[in-house]
Amino acid sequence: MIRFSSRYMIAALLLCGSVHFAQAQKVMEEYEVFPTRLETDIPYRIPAIATASNGDLIAVADYRYCRMDIGFAGTGDGRIDLRASISKDNGQTWEAPFTIVKGKGRGFDVFHTGFGDPCVVADRNSSRVFLLSCAGNVSFPGGTREKHQGIAIMHSEDNGKTWSEPKDIAEDVYAMFDKCSRGPVRAMFIGSGKIHQSRYTKTGKYYRLYCSNLVTDVNGARLNYVLYSDDFGDTWKVLGDKEDVPIINGDEPKVEELPDGRIIISSRCGGGRLFNIFDFENKEQATGKWGKQAFSG
């Protein structure tokens, strides 16, 4: 069962820099945003959260008809929907969950089988919200360059109330790694629940977005890169030199912007976490280099 308790909700919002401590103190009671009360209920999994420019909180989660991760349903249907709930009072109460996109299950085109593991970010200066998720019916471990998970993107123009149809950008992202020494990559898991909007860098209409990915290279090694977008998620580029891998042997990475504008990536590993920091030579052109990978233990 997934519960958003007051302390977890507060922690998530403070990490987003969206709620002052005095406001957070007012959230005293636990509220079950995505209820899964019985074993027979369709389970919710993998929640993500963002704060819209109007102050609304937008929570998104998998609604797993197949009860499994993407690609692990075996001979089952494989259907996973994405659902959202909105709070207009800083998390004290939430609207009933509604469907952003329905998975169609096995038997349709592979991309629309299911959508899961979302990450979401809201533009600070407009009513636009961007969502990215895995898609399809191929597991991450089972991915190949020719047959892999999709990467679905969706936009909302009204602070998360309604959403565009999903678009698959997987080929554009995979192709960026085809000609590097570790490519072509065999599989990719993008976002890991976190997209960050820069507080400082704006080269066009929007402040820059950053997210991280987990890939298996041509030899099966697990690598983490950071991607960035200057058009609010429509297109993405690799931060830094693709030959200069920021994290090796990490899993489920997250990316954040330091107070001085540098970019830090943090990735889970056995016994702790791996870290690296990107120093910019030119922030607008996104040029610079990664430091040396460090272990928290």
Which residues does each predicted region cover?
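Bacterial Sec-dependent N-terminal signal peptides
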Residues: 1-26
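Asp-box/BNR beta-propeller blade signature and adjacent active/binding-site loops
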Residues: 25-297
